[in-house]
Amino acid sequence: AAGRIGHAYLFTGTRGTGKTTCAKIFAKAVNCLDTTSPDPCGKCEICKGIDSGSIMDIIEMDAASNNGVDDIRDLRDEVAYLPSVCKYKVYIIDEVHMLSTAAFNALLKTMEEPPEHVIFILATTEVQKVPVTILSRCQRYDFTRITADDIAKRLLYVAGEEKIDLDENAAQLIGRLADGAMRDALSILDTCAGVDNKVDEALVRRMAGVTDRGYLFEISDAINAHDSVTALEKIAELRQQSVDMRRLCMELAGHYRNLMLCA
């Protein structure tokens, strides 16, 4: 990859799709001591140091809480210094769209003439809020939502590595609930595994406050029969079980959609 590395990258996409994770992998790839492959080896001191967070040349900054011009000016002062152990100093600025206008202007000055040893990786969920002057200086990569099937496959792999007894139907359900965000899926799995090492569909539904499909059929049948009393009774039962009512509405809409597709 020598000679083809840019000085500014923009990773954009919905939350939980791996932007920050990929930024760290990129930081390892450009600094890895094993130059026989474009992929990081994961075994050298640099790769291990980045994984553990002990390498000072990889700087993560949360723009949501460090969004002022002074924060960027401090960063601008730091970039002049050579990296201590890595080939490149990599600045990962998460939620970059949260920077103030003055902070963006200060960042732009640095990005216009970046030192040879510095790489910026900007991550955002709202790319439309990033000034065009910043966008024009970045190589852009869009992170799309991850499919439920791909999330389920990854969860089954993680469960195997962590010795969690994860049911395949439960993995598929978590994949759908995560709405394309792997981070959310892993969080749901972790929450369920904290309650019971055997994670099945019923446990996922209970922990996530998801309606049992039997209730969806009972409610839809009552509505179709114009039996409002039964429908409201079933909804009241779910409310008593602490089921999220907004999620219930979404699930009912999805249920009716599935019924229409099957008709």
Where do the PLM segments sit?
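P-loop/Walker A NTP-binding region and its immediately flanking N-terminal helices
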Residues: 1-140
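Extended, largely alpha-helical regulatory/partner-binding modules appended to the mid-to-C-terminal parts
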Residues: 28, 52-56, 74, 87, ...
